[in-house]
Structure formats: C-alpha cells, structure tokens
Amino acid sequence: MEKERETLQVWKKRVEQELDRVIAFWMEHSHDQEHGGFFTCLGRDGKVYDHLKYVWLQGRQVWMYCRLYRSFERFRRVELLDAARAGGEFLLRYARVAPPGKKCAFVLTRDGRPVKVQRTIFSECFYTMAMNELWKVTGEVRYQSEAIEMMDQIIHWVREDPAGLGRPQLSGALATEPMAVPMMLLSLVEQLGEEDEELTNMYAELGDWCVHRILQHVQRDGQVVLENVSEDGKELPGCLGRHQNPGHTLEAGWFLLQYALRKGDPKLRMHIIDKFLLLPFHSGWDPEHGGLFYFQDADGLCPTQLEWNMKLWWPHSEAMIAFLMGYSDSGDPALLHLFYKVAEYTFRQFRDPEYGEWFGYLNQEGKVALTIKGGPFKGCFHVPRCLAMCEQILGALLQRLEPAPLDSSPAVSTHEGSK
C-alpha cells in the first residue's frame, strides 16, 4: 500500500509539472493579440509558421482554458480567462460561414475570413463545447444560448437530415457510420449535462442512443472494434470495413466509462473495460518498439494509410486517461500497470524537455518524424486534457489511500448512525 501511494504521488507530481509546462507553451506562443483567437501552427520552439486558424482547434483551446480555470486553483488566472474570452468572441464573429446559418468553417484566415469548409460536424461540436464552457466560467447567458442552438442543429444533422452538411448522396457510396459521430455527440451530452439537471434530462435519450451506436462497433463476436460500420450496425466490406484505430477506441472507452459510472451499470463497465480498453491495447501495442500503432487492419493485412505504423501523440494521451479511469473505477491492478506502461513510453518519447509541449508525430521506432508542436490537427487539447484529467484522478486515488483519521468520539450504534 505504501509503495503504491509513493508511485501514485510521483506520477501526480510529474503530470502536474508537465501540465504547467504545456500550458505555459501555449500561453506564450499561440495568442493572437491583434485579432483574437489562437495560432496553432507552431514550430518546435513555438514560432508561428502559418497564420491560418482552424475552427475546431480554436474551440478546443477555448474549452481547455476555461476547464483549467474552472477546475484548478493555480489556473484561476485573469490572463487565461481573457485569452479564452477573446477566442470565444473570435468564434462568435467569424466561425459561421453564412450567419444566421449554423455551418462553421474548417479553416479561417488570421482575421477571420473563411478558407475551407468540411462536410462534417466537428467544427460545430467544438464550437458548442467552447461556448458552454465559457458560460460556465463567465455566467454570460449568450454563450449558453449559442451552445444550445448549435447543439440542436448538430442533432438535426445527425439524426434527421444531413443535407445541410453539403455531402452529395452518391449511388455507389456505402451508408457508413464512423464511430467518431456518436462519440462526439456523447461527449457533448456529458459536457452540456454536467451539473445541469434540466439538460441532463433533455439529452438523456440522446446519450443512450449514442452509447448503443458506439457499442455496435464491437464486431466478430466481440473480437474486434471497427472504426466504421453500416448504419444498422453490421461490418462493411473492404478496407473501410476492416479499418481500426486503437487510440480512438481507447478514447471511446473512457467516454463510455463516464456514461456507465453515471448510470451505475457495473455490467456495462466491465464490458467497456474488456472491449474498449484491453482489446485495442493488446492488438494495437507495438511489441517490438512500444507505443500504439495509429491504424490497423482487422484481418492483419497492410493498412493503406501511409502513416499507419506511426506513433501519434493523441492515442497515447487518450490511453493514459482510459487506463487510469478504468483502474479508479475497477481497482484492477492490471489497468494501473497499463497506465504506467503507456505513461512511461509517452513521457519518454513525446515530451520535449528543451522547448516544452510534446512532439506529435513519431516513426515506428519512436523517433521524432515531425518537429512541429502544432498544426491543422494538433492544438492545445489532447495533451493538456490528458494531463489535467490524470492529475485529478491521481489526486482522488491518493485521497482514497490516506489513512483514516483517528476518531476519539464515542462509538455510535448502526441504528443510531443511520438516522
């Protein structure tokens, strides 16, 4: 017990210090003081190499800053909140391509002019998360109104009519459900319903629907989790159907664990740990060099994606959260061992002790392939979210291990104590 406490304390300290360094990097290098919002195309030393702004990453950074401000005393700093507010106002002014329409751009110029639109829901989802979190820290109702209105639009696109996304309906295209869509909606249900009974009730059926859809990605009698299935939950033919993303499955795992904990469903929790934590880890971990493969093929064939055998920052971040949350819930020491294994690899290979933050892209052997710290797909999100959540879970675990205080008060009978 004492050794376990010491190891947890060491990791809590490491995680805490790393979170401070990561946030310091983004606060120093990413803020656009002229137009608001954030630069995410940052080199190893934080130098901006492109001024384009990616709406989903803008929303993620606003959310991250607000969540830190709200959750940690040491981050309750005016400059953090001011930057989050400036990012939120930038999104309010420029994210939507043709207001009052809700479709958001994917890429904006530095001063907010639209460059590119994606035919997906993800810019809108992170816009929603940003607005809701801004409301939680500022109390300004206009942010919450934006979040609820955008959430309604996203639900309409996903469950009723996707025409507004602009995707052409082609006769040869398979009707496909990527796991990312119900995952993202489940994350929004968790975000909006947090400490809000009215919204929890409003989105309860949606949350159940999302979980049902995610669980349909467990295929072949529970032997694999596939990234894409048909709309009725069947395996698809070809490379698309065999495609696996271990990191995404692990991220879905902790999303599902949060849901199962809220529901008080121990059977579901065990199913999630087995299929969404242990299964993707054992199939996705590189036995020779360590680290999680980015993509895999369910039949063991060579994936067609050029980056399939690379090691990326975010799957390892999500694995750290998943295994620590799984251990916190189940007490299974095997899950704590896997957390340590992933965390050791991640801290050793991804973090940059010289300039701060983490490298995002390693080759299979674990050597840095791209020296950039941010780009179109890597911003201030997966790394700090991982570190913040792990710090909180480690803190809660250590509290559980604290010896009970000596109580000198007289004993109370069970009957009296229950009154």
Swiss-Prot record:
* Catalytic reaction(s) noted: an N-acyl-D-glucosamine = an N-acyl-D-mannosamine
Residue list for modification Phosphoserine: 418
Enzyme Commission code(s) on record: 5.1.3.8
At the top of the EC hierarchy, this enzyme's class is isomerase
Pfam families the UniProt entry points to = GlcNAc_2-epim (PF07221)
Give the start-end ranges of region Leucine-zipper.
Answer: 185-206
> Per the record's keyword annotation, is Lipid metabolism included, yes or no?
no
Q: In which pathway does it act?
A: Amino-sugar metabolism; N-acetylneuraminate degradation
**Gene3D superfamilies in alphabetical order:** 1.50.10.10
Q: Which domain of life is it from?
A: Eukaryota
Molecular function via GO: identical protein binding; N-acylglucosamine 2-epimerase activity; peptidase inhibitor activity
Keywords of the record: Isomerase, Phosphoprotein
Q: Where is this site: Important for enzyme activity?
A: 380
Complex and partners: Homodimer. Forms a heterodimer with renin and inhibits its activity.
Primary role: Catalyzes the interconversion of N-acetylglucosamine to N-acetylmannosamine. Involved in the N-glycolylneuraminic acid (Neu5Gc) degradation pathway.
Name of the protein: N-acylglucosamine 2-epimerase
